[in-house]
From Swiss-Prot:
Gene3D superfamilies: Phosphorylase Kinase, domain 1. This is Phosphotransferase FrzJ. The gene is FrzJ. It catalyses: (1S,3S,6S,7S,8S,9S)-6-[(4-methoxyphenyl)methyl]-3-(methylamino)-5-azatricyclo[6.3.1.0(1,5)]dodecane-7,9-diol + ATP = (-)-FR901483 + ADP + 2 H(+). ATP binds at N38, K59. The active site is at D245. Pathway: Secondary metabolite biosynthesis. Keywords: ATP-binding, Kinase, Magnesium, Nucleotide-binding, Transferase.
C-alpha cells in the first residue's frame, strides 16, 4: 500500500501495520461491501496459511460505525463476535474446540461458521476465514438462476434454515449467558439498539401515519413495556440466546451453485456481533419480515416459499406462539426504514403499514380471524401444531 493509499484509508494502513509481523501479514487489503458496523476487508496473504488459505477476511471495529456517520457504538461488539464464533453458540459438540469451528449435519443440511484465526483485542480486529464461492440468500433469490429454481427447492431451503434456527434456540433455552459465553450478557449496547429498533421505531411511526396507526399507539406502548419487563427479568416466554441479526441480505450464505447440487445444502452463518438474549419469537419475526420485504418490494416469489419452509422447519408453534410471532413480524415491518422511503408510491407504503398494523393488533388481541385475512394467515396456520 503506497503513501497515497495509506492516507486515503488510514484504517487499512493501521491493519496492515498490525498484521505485518504475524502469520496473517497481508500484501493488500480491499474493502468488502456491506459493513455498517465494522470496517471489513479481504486481505491477500503474503504467505499461504498452513490450511492453504491465501486470503482472509479482516473485521475491524472503531468507536463509530463504518457505514453511519455520526453514530457511535462500543468496540465491545467485536469481542462478542469473536467469542461467539469461537465457542459460544456451539449447538452441537461436533468438532474439536481447538479448531475454532463448528458445524452440524441436520436433515441433509450442514451449518457452519467462519473459522476465527485470530482476535486482536488491543486493536479490536478479527481475522476470519474467507468463505469463497458463497452468496447471500438475497443474492440467490435475485439472481437469474432462481428463475429456473422450483418452489420446492426454495421451500426446502427455508425448512432447513428453520430447523437450524430452532435447534439454536432450543440449545440456548434455559442456559445462562455464562454457560454459553462469558460476554453475551454484557452486550448491552446491542440489546439497547435492537430494543429501540423493534419497539421504539413503531411508536414513532404513529406520528408519521396518524390516520393509520393512531388507534394502536396504546397497544404499541404496551408491547414495548412488556418487552422491557421481560428483558429486565429474563423470564419471558421462550426467552434465550439468539443470533440477533439473521438477515437474508447479509448473514446467511449458501453455495453459489446450490441449485445444481441441492441434495446436500450447506449454510454458513456470519455476523454474530448482535448475539444477545431475547425472545425467540422476535428473531422468527425478524426472519419472516426480512424475507417478506423481498416479496413486497421486489416481487420475488421465492421469498414466500422460503417463509413457508421456515415455519415448517422451525419447531411446531402453538396458537399463542403464532400470535407472538405475528406481533414481532408486524413490529419489524413497521420499524423498517422502507416506511420512510420515497422510492415507492404513497399507497404502496400505506398498504404495507396497514399489513404491519393488522399483524400487530391480531397478535396482541389473539384475533385469529384478522390474522387469517393477512398474507401470512395461510402459512401461519399451516405451521401450527
Amino acid at each position: 500500500m503506497g503513501t497515497t493509499e495509506r492516507e486515503s484509508d488510514p484504517i487499512a494502513a493501521l491493519i496492515l501495520d498490525r498484521l505485518s509481523c504475524t502469520e496473517y501479514a497481508c500484501s493488500s487489503l480491499s474493502r468488502v461491501n456491506g459493513g455498517l458496523m465494522n470496517f471489513i476487508y479481504r486481505g491477500t496473504l503474503s504467505r499461504p496459511l498452513p490450511d492453504g488459505a491465501t486470503t482472509v477476511i479482516v473485521k475491524h471495529a472503531e468507536e463509530y460505525l463504518s457505514g453511519i456517520e455520526g453514530l457511535s457504538l462500543s468496540t465491545y461488539r467485536s469481542v462478542i463476535a469473536a467469542i461467539t464464533l469461537s465457542f459460544g453458540y456451539c449447538v452441537m459438540d461436533v468438532e474439536s474446540v481447538q479448531t475454532n469451528r463448528y458445524c452440524v449435519a441436520l436433515d441433509e443440511v450442514e451449518v457452519a461458521v467462519p473459522r476465527v484465526y485470530k482476535f486482536d483485542a488491543e486493536s479490536n480486529t478479527q481475522i476470519l476465514e474467507d468463505i469463497t464461492g458463497y452468496i447471500t440468500v438475497c443474492e440467490f433469490l435475485t439472481s437469474r438462476c432462481t428463475q429456473s429454481t422450483s418452489p420446492a427447492f426454495t421451500t426446502r431451503l427455508g425448512f432447513r434454515l428453520g430447523s437450524w434456527l430452532g435447534g439454536l434456540h432450543a440449545w440456548g433455552e434455559g442456559r445462562s449467558p455464562a454457560e454459553i459465553i462469558g460476554g453475551v450478557e454484557e452486550n448491552q449496547e446491542a440489546q439497547d439498539g435492537s430494543f429501540d429498533f423493534f419497539y421504539g421505531n413503531p411508536v414513532r411511526r404513529v406520528e408519521q401515519f396518524p390516520h393509520l396507526l393512531g388507534d394502536c399507539k396504546e397497544v404499541l406502548e404496551q408491547i414495548r413495556d412488556r418487552a422491557a419487563r421481560e428483558q429486565k427479568s429474563r423470564t419471558g416466554e421462550k426467552f434465550g440466546f439468539v443470533h440477533g441479526d439473521i438477515l437474508s441480505r447479509k448473514s446467511v450464505l449458501i453455495p453459489g451453485d446450490s441449485v445444481t447440487r441441492d441434495q446436500h445444502l450447506r449454510f454458513v452463518i456470519i455476523d454474530w456481533e448482535l448475539s444477545q438474549y431475547e425472545c425467540h419469537f422476535r428473531e422468527c419475526g425478524e426472519v419472516l419480515g426480512d424475507l417478506y420485504l423481498l416479496k413486497r418490494f421486489q416481487d420475488i416469489d421465492g421469498a414466500m416459499s422460503i417463509i413457508q419452509g421456515f415455519l415448517e422447519g422451525y419447531p411446531p408453534l402453538n396458537e399463542d406462539a403464532i400470535f407472538r410471532t405475528a406481533i414481532y413480524l408486524g413490529l419489524f415491518l413497521l420499524a423498517n426504514e422502507v416506511t420512510l422511503s420515497t422510492d415507492y408510491p404513497k399507497q404502496q407504503i400505506e398498504d404495507f403499514v396497514i399489513l404491519a398494523r393488522d399483524l400487530v393488533l391480531a397478535g396482541w388481541h389473539k384475533d385469529r380471524e384478522t390474522l387469517a385475512k393477512t398474507v401470512f394467515g395461510p402459512v401461519f396456520f399451516r405451521a401450527m401444531n
